[in-house]
Regions:
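Membrane-proximal basic amphipathic "stem/tether" segments
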Residues: 2-60
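N-proximal low-complexity "stem/linker" segments adjacent to membrane-targeting elements
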Residues: 36-114
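Short loop->beta transition adjacent to catalytic acidic/histidine clusters or analogous donor-positioning motifs
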Residues: 76, 115-130, 153-155
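Short beta-strand/loop segment that forms part of the nucleotide-sugar
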Residues: 125-136, 159-162
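Active-site-proximal specificity loops/subdomain of glycosyltransferases
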Residues: 138-144, 148-200
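Short beta-strand-to-loop acidic/aromatic patch adjacent to the donor-nucleotide binding site
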Residues: 201-212
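Conserved catalytic core of nucleotide-sugar-dependent glycosyltransferases
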Residues: 214-283
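Conserved small/polar residues in nucleotide/adenosyl-binding loops
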Residues: 287-289
Length: 289
């Protein structure tokens, strides 16, 4: 993509014949034209600060230009791991704001639903929700259900059976200490999430029930996945939370431009991330929890 100015065009809503021909020619040649008088991208009828990216087709960032999407996203499955009966895996700590765990769970789900519906382009993408719950009370499960009903969104609930995974889970951590029952149930939930990914079509977002999302979080991840995966020509993993512990040591990295944010390459992450079914199927046998 190349950006050219239109300084010689008058600031008028009346489009002349030559201007129409010029714009059509630019579209054919793959140029995007910015009218510096009106700050419009006239070839796509957008203002300069409007969202110019078209999901599944191209990713546009000003002033860097366009990336043709060669890896379009087909669908997104959001798998939420919930456990409202446990405040923290380490019970001697308190959460920020010191509220009941269900409050964090409900706010997480609500923020995800808002984010999934905030961008009109996401209406063309199949987005499914699945909740894998461990040991929440019936009262709390009803509260979760009411959130989905409020947003008129269907979801699938799985009640976790920890016993199915106990033999696969290591009972001693890297420090040689026994792991707690809460940690075992958390690992079992992760196992179940990965197994559920086999039934998904394309992208999967694994998320714990204590992450608040901005209105553009889902669209940013989708647009960024398409952009970077198309640039690199391979499947990737996106970690939306920039954890402080990742800055405790210096390391060689790479920086990428997403839709509205900069992203950097990391070597590790916690268990809230977005990736593709292809990645899960390729590496599932290598994952040990």
């Amino acid at each position: 993509i190349y950006f050219a100015s239109m300084k010689n065009f008058q600031n008028s809503k009346k489009t002349g014949f030559l201007k129409k021909i010029f714009i059509k020619l630019c579209r054919i040649l793959g140029f995007e034209i910015i009218d510096q008088n009106t700050f419009e991208i006239v070839t796509i009828d957008k203002k300069i600060n409007d969202e110019a990216t078209i999901i599944g087709k191209n990713s546009i960032n000003l002033p860097l230009g366009i990336v043709k999407v060669t890896r379009p996203v087909k669908s997104l499955d959001i798998i939420i791991r919930t456990c409202t009966s446990v405040n923290m895996l380490t019970q001697n700590k308190n959460r920020l704001f010191e509220k009941e765990k269900i409050e964090y769970t409900l706010r997480t789900i609500r923020s995800l639903l808002y984010s999934a519906k905030s961008n009109t382009q996401l209406k063309n993408l199949k987005i499914s929700f699945k909740v894998i719950d461990h040991n929440s009370s019936e009262e709390n499960l009803k509260k979760i259900d009411s959130i989905f009903k409020k947003f008129e969104t269907e979801y699938y609930l799985i009640n976790l059976d920890v016993s199915k995974f106990e033999k696969e889970i290591k009972k001693i951590n890297e420090r040689g200490q026994d792991i707690s029952s809460n940690q075992i149930s958390n690992m079992a939930n992760i196992h179940q999430s990965l197994l559920e990914a086999k039934n998904c079509e394309d992208l999967i977002y694994f998320v714990e029930d204590d992450y608040l999302h901005q209105r553009n979080s889902i669209s940013e991840m989708i647009f960024t996945y398409e952009r970077i995966a198309s640039q690199l020509n391979k499947e990737i993993i996106i970690c939306p939370s920039d954890y402080p512990y990742l800055y405790t040591r210096a390391g060689i990295t790479q920086n990428f431009l997403g839709q509205n944010y900069h992203w950097r390459k990391v070597d590790e992450t916690l268990c809230t991330f977005l990736t593709s079914k292809q990645i899960i199927e390729k590496y599932l046998s290598l994952i040990h929890i």
